[in-house]
Amino acid sequence: IAQAATQLEARFGKLDTLINNAGVVFEGWGSKASETTLDAWRKTFETNVFALVAVTQALLPLLRKSDAGRIVNLSSILGSLTLQADPNSPIYNFKAAAYDSSKAAVNQYSIHLAHELKDTPIKVNSAHPGWVKTDMGGQDATMSVVDGAKTSVWLATLPADGPTGGFFHMQAALPW
């Protein structure tokens, strides 16, 4: 990570946009929280949260040099505590405890980083790409990769008066 930051600085001098796209599921969809191994929890958080934080910390000095830095943290609707707890929510019965918790942590990190950077031109937001046809999403997913990228592209190109510290999908705010 440090080497990448050094190379980016040497080549460009700054960084305008950071899109943190980290997502793994080790416990399997529909697994029980009480049976998810500590190893699965650790691996999930190592990739989905700690790697994201490490990359952000390494590249933040370059983002501070930008006139309009943007940080987009890829999350998931499965990280919404509001929707996970609502029996009427479409995701209520779709559980993967370590993955869902890691994405809730990403959302919390986005809020804290946005607060820290509120007096700078840097915007920080979480994005739910949707259920995308990828190796992780599978072929039954409802969105193409192009459509799945739309929220990230929108957040990466926000104007100066755009939102920060939010959670979005297709330009609509999602509940925490």
Residue locations for each model-derived region?
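Conserved amphipathic alpha-helix within the SDR
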Residues: 1-13
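A short local structural element in Rossmann-fold oxidoreductases
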Residues: 2, 83, 136-138
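Structured loop/turn residues at beta-strand edges in well-structured enzyme cores
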Residues: 10-13, 39, 120-122, 160
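Hydrophobic positions on the long internal alpha-helix
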Residues: 19, 55-59, 63, 109-110, ...
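Structural signature of the Rossmann-like NAD(P)-dependent dehydrogenase/reductase core
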Residues: 20-21, 70-76, 123-128
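Catalytic loop of short-chain dehydrogenase/reductase
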Residues: 24-25, 29-45, 64-118
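C-terminal helical subdomain
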Residues: 104-107, 112, 119, 126-127, ...
